[in-house]
Amino acid sequence: MSAQDVENAVEAALDPSVGPIIKQQATDFIGSLRSSSTGWKICHEIFSEKTKYKPSTRLICLQTLSEKVREWNNESNLLELQMIRDSVWSYIKELSFLDEPAYISNAVQHLLTLLFLQLYPSNWNDFFASLQGVIAASSQSEFSNFYLKVLLSIGDEIADSLVLKTDVQIQKDNLVKDAIRANDMSDIVSFVYEMMLAYSNAKNYGTVGLCLQVYAQWVSWININLIVNEPCMNLLYSFLQIEELRCAACETMTEIVNKKMKPLEKLNLLNILNLNLFFSKSQEQSTDPNFDEHVAKLINAQGVELVAIKSDPSELSPELKENCSFQLYNLFPYLIRYLSDDYDETSTAVFPFLSDLLVSLRKESSSKELSASLKEFLKSLLEAIIKKMKYDESQEWDDDPDSEEEAEFQEMRKKLKIFQDTINSIDSSLFSSYMYSAITSSLSTAATLSPENSWQLIEFALYETYIFGEGLRGPDAFFNEVDKSPTVLSQILALVTTSQVCRHPHPLVQLLYMEILVRYASFFDYESAAIPALIEYFVGPRGIHNTNERVRPRAWYLFYRFVKSIKKQVVNYTESSLAMLGDLLNISVSPVTDMDAPVPTLNSSIRNSDFNSQLYLFETVGVLISSGNLTPEEQALYCDSLINALIGKANAALSSDLSALENIISVYCSLMAIGNFAKGFPARGSEEVAWLASFNKASDEIFLILDRMGFNEDIRGAVRFTSGRIINVVGPDMLPKVPQLISILLNSIDMNELVDVLSFISQLIHIYKDNMMEITNRMLPTLLMRIFSSLSAAPQGTDDAVKQNDLRKSYISFILQLLNKGFGSILFTEENQVYFDPLINSILHFANLVGEPATQKSSIALVSKMVSLWGGKDGIAGFENFTLSLTPLCFEMPVNPNFNTRDGQSLVVLGELAGLQKIILEKLGDIYKSYLVTVYFPTVNFPDVMASEYLQALSNLDSRSFKQFFQKFIQALKSGNV
């Protein structure tokens, strides 16, 4: 490997005309240069021979040298570090960086920084003095800029709190900072000040800006008096008046204010800075939004500090408390001014101050009445918040769900809502009165404007209405408890629903209007006269027939929610609603690709359609048919009509290529539509209902579909879903078909589906109870074989591991349900007896899975249930030996080094183990005690005294007390304190 080889490799790697194979070889060569123990020498050679090699090659070499310098130890690699330092220092003294590209100069600065960190102070104690000497010898600003950028680079390395570092690195950085503070800090700050003064007089504001950056970056860890002194502060104040420097000066002031100090010291600092004079001059809207944002950040910093000082429990004299409050109150006008700013970046800059202030005022209001001036301030805050809550007059709503600007606005709204909520908690009467006025005046003003100019006001009024009663439930939300008069929320809702808002053409207004109707649907229990108009709105062109692609599918869901919420009142509008829904029940999903699926799939096709939202319409139809005032004949007719149409669509697809994606989509969508239609019907009771025949017929057709297309996982999933919904509707009518259904499902099942199948069978057991016992007995061998096979397979990546974990949980839960439902006897039948030992072993394996506390807990609970059912003299023959064999689980698993007894979930596991021991004792009594004393405890060398104490606790303490004892016992055992 030679220097020329490196240059050739860099050229090849960067040349767009070079083929991919050569380019990869070149990249690999550069990688080997960096990883090689001697590659740095070639890089050093290339850097030293400045004129011989191209800048791109030298950049790669500088980066490689930087990596090595960072890796090296300043003791074992001292010679190498000094060699590179000497070369870099020669480069700097020769002013070589003046005619270099900026990226080379930056790389040299970074390398110099890393050398400094390795060698300062013991092997390079004159670093700053030497560098300042070189800079002072030249009048060119480029030298000064180089020096200042090195200081900034040092600050990035040792004082950036956002960079995660090891404790060793933090300690090393602190040693460097201590050395700088002790040896060089005063000279550095003075040198930078002199540069700042000289270059500001020369109007070289670029270099002055770098000086300010250094002050801003370094002030957090240096003596504050080095910067906060009369000459320096006068200079900084003057920069606040210079357009080119005022933003940088603001940043420096902000960092000075942010410096961590004791409350009393910070208050004195803020008194010295006296920034209110500057704020008062900056109040008017400037022509520079960037400067306004910087001023807002400075106000925010001072406000946060003052609130913290005011809230600090440490004792301040009455005079200082008054001074702090005075400074804080003087900030209020500036807070409101910048909170109200037209630019969101400026407004959000004061959010932390506002948040802390409101929390402080809430605490204050809990112990005393707020003053009139503070209440006026809260009103001013609400006025500013409301201004920011509104869309700008010139702004249009972007209905693209991926719009970044819209997302940012909604995120800001969430934060503003928190401020509103806090003000409400401070003074609910003031808040309610103000918001009522704001909402009503917005609606009144909007009524005088054209639709294109009024939507922002109406949207604001509706949005505030939507969030106003969030969390309120029951009659108290709408009527005052004392005199039963309407609450403010009730008055607002009455105004909104009787206004002309519902006629507004803007899609966002239409959407919010429906959201309000759904959120406050219980309001119409008391205002039922409004329901006909609301139903008409929902089923009309502004609701479920909306032309807006974003509003329409949301309206389908909202109509479903509304109908479900007012089921009792909807009976009189069933036929008209069903008539308006008819044209929306045609399913049209075509094969489509997307970013996640370059080839069309069922999932990509569904994702890129409105089908999942359309399913709510099918459920809504079910709710309307079953809850309305239709005759049984009409109910049956509607059900037959819809189900026949969906089955017909599926059968049409079955008549051609079953593997064609469009046919799979058609069958899948038809099945899911039937399932969601069934969801709208109540669970079958004892009475006969008109729709039973329709759903029984549907179940027969679904079996035929499963028989034809059971090879497809998505179809199997749809059949499970739909069958589960139909079973809920038809009840025992479905029972004779269940064995065939389960048999077909199990024939083609894979691990992805096992969790769903277990859930499906659990649902059947819950519905059909003892009638499912024989069916479960027959299908259990196949099911267990599938489960054991899936759980024993090595996971092929993270997704497989997650699926296996989910299957473990479902499997344990399923077996526990069998026992809880009285199905435990099927585990001992002739068909299943052979699987009993593998089942027991699998549960014990899961109980010992250290690092999976949730799995352990449920597994141990299952074992406890088994012992409770089958242990003792009346239990199953031979189960006593198994019960005694559980003892190591109770004692040896918890002392595993990886079992964290301080973790909350692990303590729950210990609690389950304690419960297991109490159950074993209950079932075996003296047999268990004797086993512990004569067999187990001697085997593990338990001292006799400890064994005796343990048995006493086990025998005499109640379950709760023993759980606490056992948890402490295991913790002590692991720490060696027993």
From Swiss-Prot:
Cellular component per GO, a single term: cytoplasm
GO biological process: tRNA export from nucleus; tRNA processing; tRNA re-export from nucleus
GO MF annotation terms: GTP binding; nuclear export signal receptor activity; small GTPase binding; tRNA binding
Primary localization class, coarse: nucleus
Keywords, alphabetical: Cytoplasm, Nucleus, RNA-binding, Transport, tRNA processing, tRNA-binding
UniProt xrefs under SUPFAM superfamilies: ARM repeat
Compartments in which it is found: Nucleus; Cytoplasm
InterPro entries: ARM-like (IPR011989), ARM-type_fold (IPR016024), Exportin-1/Importin-b-like (IPR013598), Exportin-T_C (IPR045546), XPOT (IPR040017)
Function: tRNA nucleus export receptor which facilitates tRNA translocation across the nuclear pore complex. Involved in pre-tRNA splicing, probably by affecting the interaction of pre-tRNA with splicing endonuclease.
Family designation: Belongs to the exportin family.
Protein name: Exportin-T
